[in-house]
């Protein structure tokens, strides 16, 4: 009993240390975003000045605008493509389905730098295609589609195939069957995939760095360029806001997943 007690204490300490290692830098960053001092090691009082300066910086506002536009377009298009791909994969035989899923896995586990360089090489084949908004959005779509597939496909696999057959037996067209039977059932997966795509696009730096053009900057690229001149308190404020947005999106995904699980039972 004593050994079990010590073992539990040690395991709890280990877990606490792991979480401190993961989240302590983030906590320090958030605290420093409200610090009057320009130097993180000294606390000189609470302030919102860095946030006020952040929103007065036109270059940051422009980067925010670019990021939101790219993330919105990429997530919507990737969700549409990923949903259709999921339906196609789900209708395949097990052999071909396994091949397609493995191909999707490869694109997910590939290092971002490999994807970024390969996309840059691919875009360079087309002389009419200049690096800019189009290439950036295409790159983000490529990044996000596999995640949508793996968000939607489980919902399709849970779907009772007899429902579609019954609807068509009762006179429903394939289009009506999709919109009235299939779509409502897989909607939680579609929404989760879209939110995940938006988050991935919002957070991406490496792929954006390789596929964006001159004069176009996303928030992640802007943060990188700002750090070259030293760690400004505005960077702390900007990354804190980005972190807040990502946390909110992940909470929404978790709530929707929990509701979906409750509805199943």
Where do the protein language model's features map onto the residues?
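Interhelical loop and adjacent transmembrane-helix boundary motif
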Residues: 3-8, 50-59, 202-259
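Membrane-interfacial helix termini and adjacent extracytoplasmic/periplasmic loops
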Residues: 39-41, 48, 113-143, 175, ...
């Amino acid at each position: 009993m004593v050994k079990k007690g010590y073992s539990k204490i040690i395991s709890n300490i280990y877990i606490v240390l792991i979480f401190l290692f993961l989240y302590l830098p983030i906590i320090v960053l958030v605290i420093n975003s409200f610090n009057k001092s320009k130097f993180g090691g000294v606390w000189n009082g609470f302030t919102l000045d860095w946030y006020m300066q952040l929103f007065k910086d036109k270059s940051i506002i422009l980067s925010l605008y670019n990021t939101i536009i790219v993330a919105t377009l990429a997530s919507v298009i990737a969700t549409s493509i990923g949903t259709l791909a999921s339906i196609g994969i789900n209708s395949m035989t097990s052999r071909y389905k396994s091949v397609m899923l493995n191909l999707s896995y490869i694109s997910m586990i590939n290092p971002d730098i490999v994807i970024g360089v390969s996309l840059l090489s691919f875009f360079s084949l087309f002389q009419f295609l200049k690096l800019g908004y189009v290439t950036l959005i295409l790159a983000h779509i490529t990044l996000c589609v596999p995640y949508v597939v793996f968000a939607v496909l489980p919902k399709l696999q849970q779907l009772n195939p007899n429902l579609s057959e019954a609807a068509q037996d009762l006179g429903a067209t394939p289009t009506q069957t999709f919109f009235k039977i299939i779509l409502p059932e897989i909607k939680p997966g579609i929404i989760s995939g879209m939110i995940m795509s938006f988050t991935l696009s919002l957070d991406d730096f490496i792929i954006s760095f390789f596929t964006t053009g001159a004069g176009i900057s996303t928030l992640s690229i802007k943060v990188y360029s700002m750090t070259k001149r030293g760690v400004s308190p505005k960077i702390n404020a900007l990354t804190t806001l980005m972190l807040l947005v990502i946390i909110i999106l992940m909470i929404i995904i978790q709530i929707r997943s929990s509701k979906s699980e409750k509805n199943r039972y």
